């Protein structure tokens, strides 16, 4: 029969082995956070943010300037104006505007994000919100760069679309309407990738053909890709399919093709 001391030694040994095994378990990048010290607001992971957005459990606030938000933002995120009188180098959103957004409910859950680990905008806004007695503020400090890197699609607003088409000659616009509609007229030099030809899976259907014939920018996967469809749902479906093909700067337009066309008329 084992002595009490021997049993204790065995249990202790198993505990140590278990602890070592636990510490050696590979991490999941989707549950990772930056883990900075000295911050008064907690972080959320990419997985947590996806759940928050899916279940509408918090106000997700893009802490960047409006044009940057309009060009590319996490779907479902909101944006408010800058605090007046602040230089761009120290940009911070206006707490008063946040108050109007949440209708004065300072206990409402808020998640902030900006341009990733080295961006200070969400940290500055978090501090100002805490100083104004907000009690439920967290940050997705990994920000939009990591969101994209992990296969997250983004949205582009109408004013962002105008800006990109006027200023970014490298951007690729994808029109996902069916052939008859596309050939009847499209936006400038938009390329055709019909929604009906985009299949589940990787390297299949029309997406594979678009890779091979040059419609998709295979020699620079960082190229800005904007997807526009007959409906927002069609555009988002194709945009999400493209992110699964390792294109990580993909945005879909938040309106219809007709809305984009009307707004872009001279």
Please identify what each model-predicted range represents.
Residues 59, 67-68:
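Primarily extracytoplasmic ectodomains and periplasmic/lumenal surface modules that are beta-strand-rich
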Residues 60-62, 173-175:
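Structural scaffold elements adjacent to functional motifs in cytosolic proteins
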């Amino acid at each position: 029969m084992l002595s009490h001391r021997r049993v204790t030694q065995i249990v202790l040994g198993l505990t140590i082995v278990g602890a070592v095994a636990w510490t050696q378990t590979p991490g999941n990048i989707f549950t990772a956070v930056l883990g900075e010290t000295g911050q008064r607001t907690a972080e959320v992971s990419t997985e947590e943010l996806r759940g928050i957005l899916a279940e509408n459990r918090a106000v997700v606030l893009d802490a960047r300037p409006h044009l940057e938000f309009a060009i590319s933002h996490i779907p479902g995120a909101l944006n408010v104006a800058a605090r007046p009188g602040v230089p761009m180098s120290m940009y911070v959103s206006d707490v008063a505007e946040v108050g109007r957004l949440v209708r004065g409910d300072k206990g409402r859950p808020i998640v902030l994000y900006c341009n990733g680990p080295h961006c200070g905008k969400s940290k500055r806004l978090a501090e100002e919100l805490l100083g104004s007695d907000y009690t439920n503020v967290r940050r997705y400090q990994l920000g939009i760069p990591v969101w994209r890197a992990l296969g997250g699609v983004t949205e582009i607003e109408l004013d962002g679309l105008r800006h990109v088409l006027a200023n970014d000659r490298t951007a690729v616009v994808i029109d996902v309407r069916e052939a008859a509609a596309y050939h009847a007229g499209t936006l400038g030099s938009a390329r055709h990738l019909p929604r009906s030809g985009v299949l589940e899976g990787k390297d299949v259907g029309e997406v594979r053909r678009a890779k091979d014939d040059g419609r998709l920018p295979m020699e620079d996967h960082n190229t800005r890709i904007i997807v526009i469809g007959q409906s927002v749902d069609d555009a988002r479906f194709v945009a999400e399919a493209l992110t699964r093909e390792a294109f990580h700067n993909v945005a879909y337009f938040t309106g219809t093709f007709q809305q984009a066309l009307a707004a872009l008329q001279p």
